[in-house]
Amino acid sequence: MFEKMTIEDCLSKESDLINLSLERIKCIDSAVKSFITVVDKQEELEGPYKGIPIAIKDNITTKNIRTTCGSKMLENYTPPYDATCVKRLKNYGFAIVGKTNLDEFAMGSSTERSAFFVTRNPWDLDYVAGGSSGGSAAAVASGEVVAALGSDTGGSVRQPAAFCGIVGFKPTYGLVSRYGLVAFASSLDQIGPMTKSVRDAALIMEVIAGKDPMDSTTVSKKLDFLTHIEDGISGMKFAVPEEVYKYEQLDREVSDRFEEALKTAEKLGAKVSRVKIPTIKYAVATYYIIAPAEASSNLARYDGVKYGLRIEEPGLMDTYMKTRNVGFGEEVRRRIFLGTFTLSAAYYEAYFGKAQKVRKLLSDDLNRVLADFDAILTPTSPSPAFKIGSVADPLTYYLMDIFTIPANLSGLPAISVPFGFAKNLPVGLQIMGRRFDDPKVLAIARAFEKYSPYNINGRIPLPVVRI
C-alpha cells in the first residue's frame, strides 16, 4: 500500500508513485487538510530518487508554486526561485506534489493559527496535528506523501512529528541552508526532514545538507548520515534532565512512555543517568523574548510596497497600518508587538540583552552535560495532541515547546522518534546530541525505533484515516 511506503520502499517499486500520491491526496485531504496547494503537473526530473513524492512546508520557497506562509499577507505570492533545499531535492529526482499547511509564518504549535484552515491529526480528526509544521506531519502520517520538509524554530518539526507518530529531525544549526526559508527568527530557524522512518530522515539529510554560498551561516562540514545508523547504543551514556520530572504539566501517560524508553535503552546496553540543567527552566521565557524580537524585524518587510497584500488607503502610513492589520493574524501581531517592545530603547537591555545572556548560559549547560554523555533524552512534548479549539490561553500554548526549545537556543541537533501512545494518540521521544553529532543522533533514534515494543513487524505503526 502506497500510504505505508518509505523512501527505501519506493526505490524498489516500478509503479507511478506520483499519481498514487495525488490520488491519496484527492481521497483524504478534504478531511485531513494537510495541503494549501497541490501540484498536479510535475517537472521532468532525473536522479536516484526520481518520482518519489515529497511535500514542502509552505514557508519554503518553490519556483512557480505559490508560497503563502499560511498568511493572508502572502496568499497570492508565487516565488521566482527555489529554496536551496528544494533545488537539491529536485536534483535528486524528488517530485514536489504540494505545499503543506502551517501556523501563520510558522508561529504556533497546532496549525490552528493558519489563516486558511486547521490541519487535523490523522490518528483522530478531532485533534490537532501539532505545529507549526502540522501540514507536513499530517501529510506523512496519513500516507499522502512519502516524506516532507518542515522548519523548526522552537520545535516545529519535532512536536508535530510526535503528535502524528512520525520521525522529525532538527539538524545542527548551519548544516542545512536557510536560503529560501521565509524568516521567522533567523538565529533559531532550521529546515529538517519529516519521515516515516529514521533511515528516511538520514537519506534526506544526505541530499539537503551542505555548504551554500547563498547562506553565510551554513558550514562546510561533510557528515555521513547513513554508514553508522545501525550501530546501536550499547555502551552509550544518556542524560535525563531532572527538570523533566519537576514539570507539573507532564502528562502521566507520556511520563510512563518515557520511562519505558529509558528501560529500553538500558536493555540495549546504554547507561541512563539523571542530571541537573538549572537554566533549562528559563528556556521558554528566553525563547519568547528572542524569537518575537527577531520576528518583529524580519516581518517589517511586509508593508504592501514590494510584494504581498496591499490595502490602499489615502495616506501612506494608513496604507502600511491597514495592510499589516488585515494581512497578519492575531498570533503574528501579538509576537510583533512583543518583539518590538523588547527591542525598544527603554527595555532592550532588561529583556533582549538579558535573554541573550541566558541563552549563552543554557547553551553552556547543555554542552557541559554533552561533554560527558552521548545524548540528552526527554519527552518531545509534555502531552499528546489536544482537541482542536481546546487551548485558548497563549501561555499554555507556548509551554508545549518546553522540551524542544533548548535545542534551538543552543543550535544542537535533536530528533523526535515515535515511542508508544498516550490517550490513544502518539507520543514522541526526543534525543538531543552534540553539535555536528547528527549521525549519532540518528543512530540512537534508529535503535529506539528498531527495538521499540510498539513496533509492528519492525515498523512504527501509522494511522488508518477514516473519512
Curated annotation (Swiss-Prot):
Q: Which GO terms describe its molecular function?
A: ATP binding; glutaminyl-tRNA synthase (glutamine-hydrolyzing) activity
GO cellular component terms listed in the entry, alphabetical order: glutamyl-tRNA(Gln) amidotransferase complex
Q: Which residues cross the membrane?
A: none
* Catalysed transformations (reactions): L-glutamyl-tRNA(Gln) + L-glutamine + ATP + H2O = L-glutaminyl-tRNA(Gln) + L-glutamate + ADP + phosphate + H(+)
Active site residues per record: K57, S132, S156
So what EC number does this one have? Answer: 6.3.5.7
In terms of PANTHER family, this protein maps to: GLUTAMYL-TRNA(GLN) AMIDOTRANSFERASE SUBUNIT A (PTHR11895:SF151), TRANSAMIDASE (PTHR11895)
**Quick one: a GO biological-process term for this protein?**
translation
User: At the top level of its lineage, which domain of life is listed?
Assistant: Bacteria
Source organism of the structure: Pseudothermotoga lettingae (strain ATCC BAA-301 / DSM 14385 / NBRC 107922 / TMO)
Which Pfam family, giving just one, matches this sequence? Amidase
Name of the protein in question = Glutamyl-tRNA(Gln) amidotransferase subunit A
Under InterPro entries, the record lists: Amidase, Amidase_CS, Amidase_dom, AS_sf, GatA
List UniProt keywords, sorted A-Z. ATP-binding, Ligase, Nucleotide-binding, Protein biosynthesis
- Its biological function? Allows the formation of correctly charged Gln-tRNA(Gln) through the transamidation of misacylated Glu-tRNA(Gln) in organisms which lack glutaminyl-tRNA synthetase. The reaction takes place in the presence of glutamine and ATP through an activated gamma-phospho-Glu-tRNA(Gln).
